Curated annotation (Swiss-Prot):
<dbReference type="InterPro" id="IPR036794">
    <property type="entry name" value="ATP_F1_dsu/esu_C_sf"/>
</dbReference>
<dbReference type="Pfam" id="PF02823">
    <property type="entry name" value="ATP-synt_DE_N"/>
</dbReference>
<keyword id="KW-0813">Transport</keyword>
<dbReference type="InterPro" id="IPR020547">
    <property type="entry name" value="ATP_synth_F1_esu_C"/>
</dbReference>
<keyword id="KW-0997">Cell inner membrane</keyword>
<dbReference type="Pfam" id="PF00401">
    <property type="entry name" value="ATP-synt_DE"/>
</dbReference>
<keyword id="KW-0139">CF(1)</keyword>
<keyword id="KW-0066">ATP synthesis</keyword>
<keyword id="KW-0472">Membrane</keyword>
<dbReference type="InterPro" id="IPR001469">
    <property type="entry name" value="ATP_synth_F1_dsu/esu"/>
</dbReference>
<keyword id="KW-1003">Cell membrane</keyword>
<dbReference type="GO" id="GO:0046933">
    <property type="term" value="F:proton-transporting ATP synthase activity, rotational mechanism"/>
</dbReference>
<dbReference type="InterPro" id="IPR020546">
    <property type="entry name" value="ATP_synth_F1_dsu/esu_N"/>
</dbReference>
<keyword id="KW-0375">Hydrogen ion transport</keyword>
<dbReference type="GO" id="GO:0005886">
    <property type="term" value="C:plasma membrane"/>
</dbReference>
<dbReference type="InterPro" id="IPR036771">
    <property type="entry name" value="ATPsynth_dsu/esu_N"/>
</dbReference>
<comment type="function">
    <text>Produces ATP from ADP in the presence of a proton gradient across the membrane.</text>
</comment>
Length: 139
């Protein structure tokens, strides 16, 4: 049997996941992180993206995160997300529309464009689309 640890994924709205996992993959402030059993304690910010969860028996689940905090302790890992949405609950049409609007906003020639905000919105839309794609592949 594979080594495991306890994972909690919590958002402001609800408790998204709680259970034993083999590993997770998440985008931290310094890049991609793979958290395996026995990982050193860690506290870091999470960028908009996804958490890829490999459960106790090898099944995968993908959850979109709009950002948050990752805490790693010896026997428990906690993801405190600003917003968390299961891949199966994401709306592809809305994500595509958000991506289109963000791209349009960035490319507009108006002087009042807030590029940082538009880029953040684009990153969130792309992350949602990636979670949708990976969720479909794992089914």
């Amino acid at each position: 049997m594979a080594m495991t640890y306890h994972l909690d994924v919590v958002s402001a709205e609800k408790h998204m996941f709680s259970g034993l996992v083999q590993k997770i993959q998440v985008t931290g402030s310094e890049g991609e992180l793979g958290i395996f059993p026995g990982h050193a304690p860690l506290l870091t910010a999470i960028k908009p993206g996804m958490v890829r969860i490999v459960k106790q028996h090898g099944e995968e689940e993908f959850i979109y995160l709009s950002g948050g905090i990752l805490e790693v302790q010896p026997s428990v890992v906690t993801v405190l997300a600003d917003t968390a949405i299961r891949g199966t609950d994401l709306d592809e049409a809305r994500a595509l529309e958000a991506k289109r609007k963000a791209e349009e906003h960035i490319s507009s020639s108006h002087g009042d464009v807030d590029y940082a905000q538009a880029s953040a919105e684009l990153a969130k839309a792309i992350a949602k689309l990636r979670v949708i794609e990976l969720t479909r592949r794992s089914m």
